[in-house]
């Protein structure tokens, strides 16, 4: 049993290591170089390390090699969920200056318009984008000098705004739930400057941008009783801190709920969490989709005489979204030249028909060429490709019957049997009626004699 226990322990350790996510996230430090140009320098976020000092990175400037301390654990939890075989996330660093919120509805967060001295110093904003999660993390580098030579810079994650649904694909007419969570841990100087225990007031802002236009969807400042703009499109947000621990760290929820989404609600959603003089923002992409329904007529059989063309085939592709990306192919299955081939004939598509729910429909037409006896039993198929469908698409088919070559089907045999049975019953019934009439006439004739 000891070797088995050892193998289980090794497997458990390997599983933990695989699911722990990257220990280092490679980034780019992006700064304004003047004249409308941007300058980029390599940087890195060191999230975990083994015993001893961090591994050296001679390719990085010490102030851009950041050993991150995450008191709330939100950043670490997100990275642990990152698959080991996924491409590395995209990360950018930029300078951040603490400022009061500019929106009128958020002015209650900062009664004083000047920034407290406790927030002086350097700040960095880390933006990490991936299909798994999207986050922004406000980092405060350590201000105390380090022993020379400095190989890295310690930084604390003060405010982290995170979503696990950076790309949301919602079925047309269904509710959308856009995940948002955030965490805050004030630095020592901030905590010393604040006399009030418990989480600070915060503001939550959701905006939608689509086709170059943007507007405020929802704003909230829980507990401040400020005059808020009316929420749009029936949007509701779960805006609250998760706990009220006196000294933090604190986590909160800002998830947005949209009922019965429609195509006009597609676009980029910007979620911003406002703290007094600090902000964090993430972007989410919402797309609406609906797979098409497919029907083919006439069905299930189409008839034609040898040397004649079958009747026109109509493939109705109904109530799908988006309109772009739809392709229709006509196939002949089981024909004389193989199991699958392109159906010959004249084909065309109708114009789009728009429905009140935002979905669209169209019809595809095929006028097949004349058939021969070899086409008997072949099947015409309408195959539809659309972004909402699997790679092979979806299809509907009808069977071709060439006149004079098909024997009676099971339905025909059953019909003939029933017809013969009814005819036999009718003959017997008529015979019984005739016999009854002749029997009733005999006594009358005897009395007359």
UniProtKB/Swiss-Prot annotation:
Tell me where in or outside the cell this protein is found.
Endoplasmic reticulum membrane
Task: State the Pfam families in the record.
Answer: C1-set (PF07654)
Recorded GO CC terms? MHC class I peptide loading complex
Q: Which residues lie on this side of the membrane: Lumenal?
A: 21-413
Cytoplasmic-side segments: 435-449
- State the Gene Ontology BP annotations: antigen processing and presentation of endogenous peptide antigen via MHC class I; peptide antigen assembly with MHC class I protein complex
Principal location class: endoplasmic reticulum
| Record-annotated disulphide pairs | 27-91, 315-382
Molecular function terms from GO:
MHC class I protein complex binding; TAP complex binding
Could you list this entry's UniProt keywords, alphabetically sorted: Disulfide bond, Endoplasmic reticulum, Glycoprotein, Immunoglobulin domain, Membrane, Signal, Transmembrane, Transmembrane helix
Sugar attachment sites? 253
Membrane topology term: Single-pass type I membrane protein
Residues spanning the membrane: 414-434
Record's signal peptide? 1-20
**Residues carrying the site annotation May be involved in interaction with TAP:** 428
Q: Which InterPro entries does the protein's record reference?
A: Ig-like_dom, Ig-like_dom_sf, Ig-like_fold, Ig/MHC_CS, Ig_C1-set, Immune_Resp_Modulators, Tapasin
Segments forming domain Ig-like C1-type: 292-399
What is the annotated role of this protein in its UniProt record?
Involved in the association of MHC class I with transporter associated with antigen processing (TAP) and in the assembly of MHC class I with peptide (peptide loading).
Free-text note on domains in this protein's UniProt record: The N-terminus is required for efficient association with MHC class I molecule and for a stable interaction between MHC I and calreticulin. Binding to TAP is mediated by the C-terminal region.
The protein's assembly and partners: Heterodimer with PDIA3; disulfide-linked. Obligatory mediator for the interaction between newly assembled MHC class I molecules, calreticulin, PDIA3 and TAP. Up to 4 MHC class I/tapasin complexes bind to 1 TAP. Interacts with HLA-G-B2M complex; this interaction is required for loading of high affinity peptides. On its own or as part of MHC class I peptide loading complex, interacts with ligand-free MR1 or MR1-B2M complex, providing for stable MR1 pools ready for metabolite antigen processing.
Q: What is this protein called?
A: Tapasin
User: What is the native source organism of this protein?
Assistant: Canis lupus familiaris (Dog)
């Amino acid at each position: 049993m000891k070797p088995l226990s050892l193998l289980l322990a090794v497997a458990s350790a390997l599983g933990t290591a695989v699911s722990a996510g990257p220990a280092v996230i490679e980034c780019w430090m992006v700064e304004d170089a003047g004249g409308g140009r941007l300058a980029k320098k390599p940087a890195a976020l060191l999230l975990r390390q083994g015993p001893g000092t961090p591994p050296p990175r001679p390719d990085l400037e010490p102030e851009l090699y950041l050993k991150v301390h995450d008191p709330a654990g939100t950043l670490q939890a997100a990275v642990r969920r990152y698959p080991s075989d996924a491409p590395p996330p995209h990360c950018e660093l930029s300078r951040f200056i603490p400022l009061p919120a500019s929106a009128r509805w958020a002015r209650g967060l900062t009664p004083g318009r000047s920034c407290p001295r406790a927030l002086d110093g350097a700040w960095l904003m880390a933006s990490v984008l991936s299909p798994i999660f999207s986050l922004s993390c406000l980092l405060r580098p350590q201000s105390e000098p380090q022993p020379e030579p400095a190989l890295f810079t310690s930084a604390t994650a003060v405010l982290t705004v995170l979503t696990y649904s950076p790309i949301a694909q919602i079925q047309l007419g269904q509710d959308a739930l856009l995940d948002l969570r955030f965490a805050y841990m004030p630095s020592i100087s901030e905590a010393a400057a604040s006399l009030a225990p418990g989480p600070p007031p915060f503001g939550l802002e959701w905006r939608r941008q689509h086709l170059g236009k943007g507007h405020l969807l929802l704003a909230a400042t829980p507990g401040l009783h400020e005059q808020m703009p009316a929420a749009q499109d029936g949007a509701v947000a779960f805006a609250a801190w998760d706990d009220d621990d006196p000294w933090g760290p604190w986590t909160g929820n800002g998830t947005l709920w949209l009922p019965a989404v429609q195509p006009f609600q597609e676009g980029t959603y910007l979620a911003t969490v406002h703290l007094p003089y600090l902000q964090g923002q993430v972007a989410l992409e919402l797309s609406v989709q609906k797979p098409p329904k497919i029907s083919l007529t006439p069905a299930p059989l189409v008839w034609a005489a040898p040397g004649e063309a079958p009747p026109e085939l109509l493939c109705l592709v109904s109530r799908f979204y988006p309109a772009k990306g739809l392709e229709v192919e006509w196939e002949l299955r089981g024909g004389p030249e193989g199991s699958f081939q392109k159906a010959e004939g004249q084909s065309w598509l109708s114009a789009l028909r728009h429905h009140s729910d935002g979905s669209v429909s169209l019809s595809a037409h095929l006028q097949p060429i004349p058939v021969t006896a070899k086409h008997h039993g072949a099947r015409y198929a309408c195959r539809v490709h659309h972004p909402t469908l699997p790679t092979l698409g979806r299809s509907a088919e009808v069977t071709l019957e060439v006149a004079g070559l098909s024997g009676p089907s099971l339905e025909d045999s059953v019909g003939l049997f029933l017809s013969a049975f009814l005819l036999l019953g009718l003959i017997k019934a008529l015979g019984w009626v005739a016999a009854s009439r002749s029997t009733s006439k005999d006594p009358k004739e005897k009395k007359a004699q």
